[in-house]
Amino acid sequence: MARIAGVNIPDNKHAVISLTYIFGVGRHTAKSILAAVGIGPTTKIRELDDAQLDAIRAEVAKVPTEGDLRREISMNIKRLMDLGCYRGLRHRRSLPVRGQRTKTNARTRKGPRKPIKK
């Protein structure tokens, strides 16, 4: 198994699919990374030599991935909460942020039902 950006990449899969195991790299980004390096998308990771893997590592390093991306996302949410805007309030109350209905549904975001005490 090759190790790219701190993630073990499966050897037996195509390069495009293998790169999507990295948080922050989807299929489109994986295709653009491979195009920049000059590797075909159907090439398997085990067929690549060390120089090609190093080139892929260098390209992946240019994209925010893994811990940096998770930190950036959490800081964006924290910024919204500190501003006190509507989206920040919805995050703070653990309710849906993007305008979904909450009278029914939204159980995943709200958590299990709380019984009414009499």
From Swiss-Prot:
One of its GO terms (cellular component) is small ribosomal subunit. Part of the 30S ribosomal subunit. Forms a loose heterodimer with protein S19. Forms two bridges to the 50S subunit in the 70S ribosome. Gene3D superfamilies: 1.10.8.50, 30s ribosomal protein s13, domain 2. The gene is rpsM. Located at the top of the head of the 30S subunit, it contacts several helices of the 16S rRNA. In the 70S ribosome it contacts the 23S rRNA (bridge B1a) and protein L5 of the 50S subunit (bridge B1b), connecting the 2 subunits; these bridges are implicated in subunit movement. Contacts the tRNAs in the A and P-sites. The keyword Protease does not apply. Belongs to the universal ribosomal protein uS13 family. One of its GO terms (biological process) is translation. GO terms for molecular function: rRNA binding; structural constituent of ribosome; tRNA binding. Keywords: Ribonucleoprotein, Ribosomal protein, RNA-binding, rRNA-binding, tRNA-binding. The keyword Ribosomal protein applies. Residues 92-118 are annotated as: Disordered. This is Small ribosomal subunit protein uS13. Signal peptide: none annotated.
